[in-house]
Amino acid sequence: ARNLILEETRQDLQENHGVFTFDYGNLSQRTPLTWSTYDHRPRFGTNMLGLRNRLSVLSEAYSYLEYPKRVEVTREFVLGIVRRAKIHGEALMQLEASLDEEASKGKPFSLGLDTALVADTPGTILLGAVDEVPIEGLGVRRVDRDEHVPTLVGLRLSFEPGRYSVHPRAWAIEKPEPGDQEVLKRHGIQFRILDAPVTCTSRRFQITEAQRAKRLFQAHYELTLVGEWEGGPTELP
């Protein structure tokens, strides 16, 4: 889907609309220069949709463009994606349907853990020059100068797992909070409330350590839980 939609949209926008697009990412502040995309965390929602066998596209305009230009190029990008989705609509729906069918069979499958960005490979990006416009009391604002130079950098455009863990057929919440049902419904997650005890084989994650980041990340201190899985017969609830 990446090559089918994004690459064709990129070519269409450049050739027919004069709009240049590239994989979402940020440039490193030190040499050698590296362009790195977002990681595995579901903070944008794109990764979360992927876990549900759905396709998603993250859009962000070049932040140094004037606001009207950012609106214009974002509109062109969204319309370009929609055009490609229409052209390849049947293939995309077949892909999602096949994934849903496979998931409905209840066969075990694995999810990647300890995920990290891939090693960088050489590639070229358009590096833009900016003017720094003073704003009284607020410092400076960087504004695109419409000068863009092809620059060789290291590209890190995807991430990969360090290990895999078998995904369970279901999750059990032994002591649900009052609002849990509403949250699950809002996310379209199917669930049922047990009206009688059920014996099953389960795994329980036993936390041995909680690691809280020392620096804020998007107004949150990221929390990482370390532990081990313990399995065996269980009676629910």
What do these predicted regions represent?
Residues 1-237:
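Structured catalytic-domain cores with a bias toward divalent-metal coordination
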